[in-house]
């Protein structure tokens, strides 16, 4: 069986084969040698916990995996264990960034050190790279430039560091896309200053499409709010954009079960949007606590209708 046939047998297309075979990392390897590496590494990666489809996808993206020995791969996992990752985390990270197997552990250590100089702790860098392994593919100059670009948008360096701790994928967004997102949100009824403030509190807004944001507004209008009220509420509690409309409906139903009408719940959440962030158990407990002070449940309900805070 030819090398191409061996690849196709494992699930690659002819186009996949050409891409891999012509890659600089393996194009000097003889066919018979590459056949052995193909079989050995493919089987080894399956044994490590990847699916057949994942191995195909990974090696198309990073053909150099077929230039590595099984010992190289095992050693990389061990080295990453010493950095603070578990084997399972390494497997997950390399599914999205298989090039990690080709990075030297010294370069990875240096990237961690460089990130620490920007204001992160080692633990934060490890956590960030678990969520966004692509950070390892960026030069420290690129990361510094992203911070500088975000400062020009209206953030401080400290705010950028804080935002990227929670949503490290921000480093993978182009500054042009971020500017466009700000413009798109402004077109919905916010000011630039309000968008900047909202994204400080909820950086994941940058990962939402403008269509998703518009859909959330439409969904909330269907619940009983006006567009203007949604805009006002999300200025106060941008985390609303991180909630599903189904969860919001359920929260309304749960609060109705406590003794309120739907209209009253809508009115209360206009005044205090953060109600959507409360668990129904905590709300029940608060009612019980106030009752223990000498009020009836009906009195508590009446009081909180007018003053939900």
PLM feature segments, named:
Residues 1-309:
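Long amphipathic alpha-helical repeat/alpha-solenoid cores
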């Amino acid at each position: 069986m030819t090398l191409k046939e061996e690849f196709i047998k494992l699930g690659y297309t002819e186009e996949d084969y050409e891409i891999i075979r012509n890659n600089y990392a393996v194009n000097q390897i003889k066919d018979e040698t590459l056949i052995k590496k193909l079989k050995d590494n493919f089987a080894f990666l399956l044994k490590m916990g990847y699916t057949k489809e994942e191995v195909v996808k990974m090696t198309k993206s990073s053909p150099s995996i077929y230039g590595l020995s099984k010992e190289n791969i095992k050693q990389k996992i061990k080295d990453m264990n010493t950095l603070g990752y578990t084997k399972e985390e390494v497997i997950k990270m390399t599914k999205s960034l298989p090039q990690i197997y080709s990075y030297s552990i010294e370069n990875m250590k240096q990237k961690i050190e460089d990130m620490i100089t920007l204001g992160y702790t080692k633990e934060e860098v490890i956590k960030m790279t678990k969520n966004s392994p692509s950070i390892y593919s960026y030069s420290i100059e690129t990361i510094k430039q992203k911070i500088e670009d975000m400062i020009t948008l209206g953030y401080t360096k400290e705010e950028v560091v804080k935002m990227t701790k929670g949503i490290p994928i921000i480093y993978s967004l182009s500054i042009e896309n971020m500017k466009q997102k700000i413009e798109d949100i402004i077109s919905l009824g916010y000011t630039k200053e309000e968008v900047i403030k909202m994204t400080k509190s909820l950086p994941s807004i940058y990962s939402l499409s403008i269509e998703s944001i518009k859909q959330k507004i439409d969904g909330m209008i269907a619940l009983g709010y006006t567009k203007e009220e949604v805009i006002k509420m999300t200025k106060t509690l941008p985390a609303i954009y991180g909630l599903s409309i189904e969860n919001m409906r359920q929260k309304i139903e749960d609060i109705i079960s406590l003794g309120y009408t739907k209209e009253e719940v809508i009115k209360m959440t206009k005044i205090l949007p953060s109600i959507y962030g409360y668990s129904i158990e905590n709300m029940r407990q608060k009612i019980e606590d106030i009752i223990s002070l000498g009020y009836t449940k009906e009195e508590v309900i009446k009081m909180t209708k007018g003053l939900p805070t």
